């Protein structure tokens, strides 16, 4: 084929290709689906029936499955209950010691199990029914709840007020002119700060609270105290009982009315130190005047268990030690008592030689309350009437001249710091004598005193068990040769043991600490701020365990005391304070220093009326734990002492952040160090 022919063929093909193929763009007629008119064919009907049946079957299956699940659930629930009950009873049998398990005969057991099975089945059925009903009710409720919202929506909607038309510019200007000089009120939204309060803020808040409380108390205090009316009758009964014939023994007036009275007076008198003065003045009619010289009168016969107040507000007990029948000692005592009385009040003491009760225990300086039962306030609360420590139940043998010595007696003296007193810290002395000791409230000079040498064992354990002397200040001893000023009373807080010639210490309690005696002849001044007249077994056992029975000069119980001059030289032996009480001690020393009412000390003894007191007292004695340690912490601080989970997480995050920062800094430092070293190495090269 030659070249020309090829070109010819190519040119022919070119012409054919030039005409493009085109599809018609005209829209054709619409295609209509042929619709079957009238009844559907049999095949279609059969198909539809089959579908419906399937749906119905599925629904039934679903229902059955649900019921089965519910049944299983109930069974499980029941099993769980039964298992838990079984476990509980099994476990608890350790606690039921002494309850015998009844052995049942096999027949009986079989019948019981049969009945129990029946009851179980019934129970299951009931529970199932209940559950189904409950489910039904629940689903109905849910359904109703679902249906209700649309009803709420279907209420005719109140058409929203259309926005006011926008103002003209001229109107706006006019309004601006008007409002230009009016002050704009900006509402300050207070942000409640979450940060904890600072110590100063806390102090301020506490101070305000205290003020408020004081005002309340003052308003309450204006109401006359009702309880103290019980006192005179009690005292009289004690007096008359003690003055009966010398042979009879009797239980001296049982302190039973005390607790009830205490309960009554507590609410009204809690924290009422500042009412001490007014209350003591308010009942002048109840003070029984003692006969001037008749120390054998019944009123003075009770004297052995009354603290003697020598007007300066310091009671000392009329308890005498049996082992010293010497007149010289009793004379020094008498002269000391007289000297004290002359100093403080114009009441002359008509006491005869021999340790006896001076009339001052009735006529005291105003504001000094006699501690004890008449006001029947909890020890540590101001007593209102004239009061004496009651002799708590126990047979009291009679002694010569009608003065009985109370063996297992407790004299509770509620001594709280009177505020405007001539002497801020009254020390109370428990007037108890050992079983063999007469408290000779009257006795001629040098009258021999019968009885064993089992003297009252002093245990001034007001600070901690085993400390011989409880008063935080030194106990000054009288020197028998020195005559009237044999008692060196230096300052308000000194205890006066001069009234006791024999050298048995009478435990002097710290202000606000009552003195109680437990057991025959054991004087235990209590360690807590409150003591109830009833003494529990626990306290007795504790006191007998922990306490070293020796008088304050360190001598043991049976030994004769050395001469008082020697005693003065030797000085009292004292154990160190347990650390738990340091804070309290500081408070008490502050108390001694200032005579005026101290607002800070207003709530010194706070938790008086609580039934916890006995328990906490024993806990304190055993463990040295003091609940009052956190007393001056505010409620706020105590509440937030334990942090919440959120706060803990915050702290964690904070510490983590700080830790990471520290790590980064350390790494940076290390890098810098490395660079420095490298630079040094390069320089050396």
Swiss-Prot record:
Coiled coil: 45-81, 123-148, 645-685
Positions bearing the Glycyl lysine isopeptide (Lys-Gly) (interchain with G-Cter in SUMO2) cross-link: 37, 187
Region (Disordered): 79-168, 188-615, 644-685
Organism: Homo sapiens
GO cellular component: nucleolus; nucleoplasm
Gene: SPTY2D1
Bias type Acidic residues, positions: 587-613
SMART domains: SPT2
Similarity comment: family membership: Belongs to the SPT2 family.
Pfam families: SPT2, SPT2_N
Region (Important for interaction with DNA): 1-570
Lineage: Eukaryota, Metazoa, Chordata, Craniata, Vertebrata
Protein name: Protein SPT2 homolog
């Amino acid at each position: 084929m030659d070249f020309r022919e090829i070109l010819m063929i190519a040119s022919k093909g070119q012409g054919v290709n030039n005409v493009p193929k085109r599809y018609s763009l005209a829209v054709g007629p619409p295609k209509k689906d042929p619709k079957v008119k009238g009844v559907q064919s049999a095949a279609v009907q059969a198909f539809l029936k089959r579908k419906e049946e399937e749906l119905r079957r599925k629904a039934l299956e679903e229902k059955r499955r649900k019921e089965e699940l519910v049944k299983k659930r109930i069974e499980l629930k029941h099993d769980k209950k039964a298992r838990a009950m079984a476990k509980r009873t099994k476990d608890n049998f350790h606690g039921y010691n002494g309850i015998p398990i009844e052995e049942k005969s096999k027949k009986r057991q079989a019948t019981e199990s049969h009945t129990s099975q029946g009851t179980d089945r019934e129970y299951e059925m009931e529970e199932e029914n209940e559950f189904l009903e409950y489910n039904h009710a629940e689903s109905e409720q849910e359904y109703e709840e679902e249906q209700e919202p649309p009803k709420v929506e279907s209420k005719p909607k109140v058409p929203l007020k259309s926005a006011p038309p926008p103002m003209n510019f001229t109107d706006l200007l006019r309004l601006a002119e008007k409002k230009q000089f009016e002050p704009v009120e900006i509402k300050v939204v207070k942000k409640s700060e979450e940060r904890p309060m600072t110590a100063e803020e806390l102090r301020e808040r506490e101070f305000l609270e205290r003020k408020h409380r004081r005002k309340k108390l003052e308003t309450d205090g204006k109401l006359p105290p009702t309880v103290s009316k019980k006192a005179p009758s009690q005292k009289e009964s004690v007096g008359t009982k003690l003055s009966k014939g010398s042979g009879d023994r009797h239980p001296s007036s049982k302190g039973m009315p005390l607790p009830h009275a205490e309960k009554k007076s507590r609410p009204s008198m809690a924290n009422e130190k500042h009412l001490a003065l007014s209350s003591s003045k308010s009942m002048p009619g109840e003070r029984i005047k003692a006969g001037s010289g008749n120390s054998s009168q019944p009123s003075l016969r009770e004297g052995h268990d009354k603290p003697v107040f020598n007007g300066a507000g310091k009671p000392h007990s009329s308890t005498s030690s049996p082992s010293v029948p010497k007149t010289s000692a009793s004379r020094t005592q008498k002269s000391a008592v007289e000297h004290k009385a002359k100093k403080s009040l114009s009441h002359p003491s008509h006491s005869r030689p021999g340790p006896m009760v001076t009339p001052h225990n009735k006529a005291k300086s105003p504001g000094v309350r006699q501690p004890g039962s008449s006001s029947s306030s909890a020890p540590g609360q101001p007593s209102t009437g004239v009061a004496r420590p009651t002799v708590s139940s126990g047979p009291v043998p009679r002694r010569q001249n009608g003065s009985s010595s109370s063996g297992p007696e407790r004299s509770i003296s509620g001594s709280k710091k009177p505020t405007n007193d001539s002497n801020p810290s009254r020390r109370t002395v428990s007037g108890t004598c050992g079983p063999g000791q007469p408290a000779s409230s009257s006795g001629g000079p040098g009258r021999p005193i019968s009885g064993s040498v089992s003297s009252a064992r002093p245990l001034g354990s007001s600070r901690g068990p085993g400390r011989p002397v409880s008063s935080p200040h030194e106990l000054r001893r009288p020197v028998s040769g020195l005559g009237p000023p044999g008692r060196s009373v230096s300052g308000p807080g000194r205890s006066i043991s001069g009234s006791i010639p024999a050298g048995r210490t009478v435990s002097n309690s710290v202000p606000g600490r009552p003195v109680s005696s437990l057991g025959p002849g054991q004087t235990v001044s209590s360690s807590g701020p409150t003591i109830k007249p009833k003494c529990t077994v626990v306290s007795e056992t504790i006191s007998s365990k922990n306490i070293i029975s020796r008088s304050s000069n360190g001598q043991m119980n049976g030994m004769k005391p050395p001469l008082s001059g020697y005693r003065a030289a030797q000085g009292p032996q004292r154990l160190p304070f347990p650390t738990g009480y340091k804070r309290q001690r500081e408070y008490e020393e502050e108390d001694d220093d200032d005579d005026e009412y101290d607002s800070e000390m207003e709530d010194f003894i706070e938790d008086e009326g609580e039934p916890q007191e006995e328990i906490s007292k024993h806990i304190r004695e055993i463990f040295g734990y003091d609940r009052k340690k956190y007393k001056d912490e505010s409620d706020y601080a105590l509440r937030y002492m334990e942090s919440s989970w959120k706060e803990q997480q915050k702290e964690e995050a904070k510490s983590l952040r700080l830790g990471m920062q520290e790590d980064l800094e350390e790494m940076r430092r290390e890098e810098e160090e490395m660079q420095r070293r490298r630079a040094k190495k390069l320089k050396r090269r």
